[in-house]
Amino acid sequence: MKKILSFLLATVILLPCFSGCAESLLPKEVPEDFSFALTWGVYGISSYDSRTGKLVKTKDATNPADYVTYVKLSDEVMELIYKKLRALNVESYPDEYDPDPMMGSDPSADLILTIRNGDRVKTVTAKDVSLSYDALFPKGKRFIDTCLDISDILTDTEEWKALPDYEFYYD
């Protein structure tokens, strides 16, 4: 009986730790092998991958290669983005996410956020997001705002500004 009680007590004490003490994808300090990728915009025409530095302004162009550049973000910018992603708690989002299932628009935006830490990867895909970037709940608004904050950082780089203007605009 003592063994059973000891086992139950140990289970009650340790079970929460096993379910909640797993190492976070984004620990407090920026991991050496942290990287992220973001796809954003109308139909997901723009993208950036910090692993390769590839920054794409648009894939909808006569010559898409003209709209591609490479940018290595500074350690300070990477740390700023890391803090935004950590505050988002990306692990709490499902792989397929709709920030506002009650809202839609045509055209619509895609937001695809991938975070890598070594061999651990988490991707959250939000397709057909209303271009008003509204969300039904605060969690959805946090996801949208984080993605837009990161895209603002990327579109503020000199490399982005040096790319040609869009050929096509969506009505």
Where are the regions a protein language model picked out?
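Hydrophobic core
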Residues: L9, I13-P16
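Polyanion-binding surfaces on beta-sheet-dominated domains and ring/shell assemblies
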Residues: S19
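Charged, amphipathic alpha-helical segments
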Residues: E23, S74-M102
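Short, well-ordered, aromatic-rich surface patches in folded extracellular/luminal domains
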Residues: E23-A37, D98-D171
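N-terminal export/targeting and maturation segments
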Residues: E23-K72
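Generic detection of short hydrophobic beta-strand segments and adjacent strand-loop junctions
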Residues: T69-K72, L80, K122-A126
